[in-house]
Amino acid sequence: MTYEEAVNYIEGIGKFASDTSLAHTDRLLDKLGHPENGKKIIHVAGTNGKGSVCAYLRTMLMEGGYRVGFFTSPHLVRINERFQIGTEEVDDDTFLWAFEKVKEAIDEFLREGGTHPTYFETLFLMAALIFQKAETDYIILEVGLGGRLDATNVIRHPLACIITSISLDHTEYLGDTTEKIAGEKAGIIKKGVPVIFDGNDRAAAAVIRRRAEEMGCPWYELTRDCCIPVSTTTGGIAFDFTWKDEKNGGSAETYRLQIPQIAEYQMANASLAFLTMLILREDHGISAERLAGGISKMVWPCRMETVLRGVVVDGAHNPDGIAQFIKTADQFHRNYKITVLFAAVSDKDHEDMIREIVEGIHPERVITTRIEGSRCISEKALAEEFVRAGQKEVCSEPDVGRAFDLACSERGDGMLFCVGSLYLAGQIKSHLEKK
């Protein structure tokens, strides 16, 4: 089998198969010899910010000289991006090796009467093998969807469980309130394992606290007042992170952190990751100064990323993410005329996102496009929604590459923001790589 054949096989698997049992995943891992056992794993769930938190964790551990495996989703351009050793995606040969091992286990499982694993399960099984072969010191696991029933939740003894900000997303799977969604995310909490979480949604935070206490876990809640901006430039944000472990009577400690991103929401993500590493100090032995150095080196594509002069790509894909995007866009670019390139998938609340964009940054013009895949919304339907929201100048172009080139030419001396979907971000990155 070739690499291309392996990718085609995986892409042909239904992403949301009917069997979501963790026992199902566990039986397949058993056939692979449970490569995940005995590994030092940090497990990360949440609605927004999961990938960024994972990326901060990675650079801090790398700053300490550790070999780090990182399983993430979705990919932007190539499926290999989901499996990273350090900051490098795995090569095609390693990808194919892992797939063939997993395919052998799947075939045996099917002969025994089992059902085929989902798209995400298959990738997770491959990740477990890849990180075992790479002899990683730590593994950072990003939940795919939810938490309680996610394939990654088969792990038994993580070092820490992190839950990032909670908002409404994937409501058809996770529930229609932040409390219900938090309940699904809190499903990753394991007995006695430290829980570090974003507490800015009070209702969601109460659910997470309750679950942590039920499981006998020490828990650490971060709120906005933990992060105080000191200075902001086009090169990033310096801020003071202050933490006081009130439950254990600790005194307040303040750390000056520098993130290389211009988005204010990254302060919370960096703080969650930094606090987690402080809590795990006895395990990794990295000083606070070196951890701060790791924070300053974090790179994570398509999160308020400037890809060309005056052109920013952001992966915000739900109303809460769009609200954070608008806050940053308005702060840095209020003196520029703004062009927006927008696309979305059908299971996202695109009406609210569109309304927030029109009311929040008042674009001079909007160009809508259509991303690849069965879940796409047509560019014409999106354009009509922008008109209903009060946007005056709107045009549509179905091809993402042509839409991007058109938007770049239309922006003039202003700013272009490309937003609405990580899939849009990935297709733009792919388009730029071909130029």
Regions found by a protein language model. Name each.
Residues 1-46, 53-66, 71, 107-114:
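Short functional linear segments
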Residues 29, 34-37, 63-156, 172, ...:
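ATP-dependent carboxylate-amine ligase catalytic core
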Residues 123-173, 205, 209-254:
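Extended acidic/charged loop-beta regions that coordinate divalent cations
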Residues 133, 138-141, 149-162, 166-170, ...:
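Nucleotide phosphate-binding/pyrophosphate-handling subdomain across enzymes
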Residues 182-190:
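Membrane-proximal helix-turn-helix segments that form the acceptor-binding/catalytic region
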Residues 198-199, 211-233, 259-264, 291-297, ...:
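Beta-strand->loop->alpha-helix junctions that form or flank phosphate-binding loops
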Residues 201-216, 220, 311, 354-415:
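C-terminal helical cap/extension that packs against the catalytic core
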Residues 421:
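Active-site-proximal loop/hinge segments that shape catalytic or ion-binding/gating pockets
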